[in-house]
């Protein structure tokens, strides 16, 4: 009779220790909370110490320019872009093959597909590179983005980046504003527009603007 298989609890070797150190992070918030600023600051901290980073952003987000991550305070950096059909594990593996990379930073992470978030998790586990994602939690209809839902399920560590509603309470929701200045209830989830089209609100004032479900 075959003995049951066992899981080795021996201390990992050097490679194993490196792999265990890497984590998948998700920094989430509503609009205009400074997520891109935090991403660029994190990247700068690595670069200042002589380390290289790999920046990724959605190819259709051109508010700061194609292949650029920009913040409202005026700083920006070049980034590689991805589509929703790209294999992000393959992109990261190809970047690592070019040379050392201390961290991967992904802006507008809500636009990723569920499969792409799993690809990031695989890159963390198998390639040993930490990945920091920054994105919105919910859309203007109060629904989770697919990428954000997957990150909330899979990320090793999560951090809420806080901003405030006009009433002073923490903002957790966002509305999309139409040409008439009123909150929209319908529309495509993916619609990249100016920051002035979106307003971050607490749940009470979101319900007041949009109406109860």
Where are these regions (language model features)?
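Short, positively charged and aromatic/hydrophobic N-terminal segments
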Residues: 6-8, 17
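Conserved P-loop
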Residues: 19-94, 139-150, 160-163, 185, ...
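A short acidic, amphipathic alpha-helical/loop segment
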Residues: 42, 115-123, 147
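Short basic/glycine-enriched coil/helix segment immediately N-terminal to the Walker B
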Residues: 92-102
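Walker B catalytic acidic pair
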Residues: 108
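Residues immediately C-terminal
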Residues: 111-112
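Sensor-1/coupling segment of RecA-like P-loop NTPase cores
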Residues: 124-147
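Conserved AAA+ ATPase core "coupling" helix
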Residues: 164-180
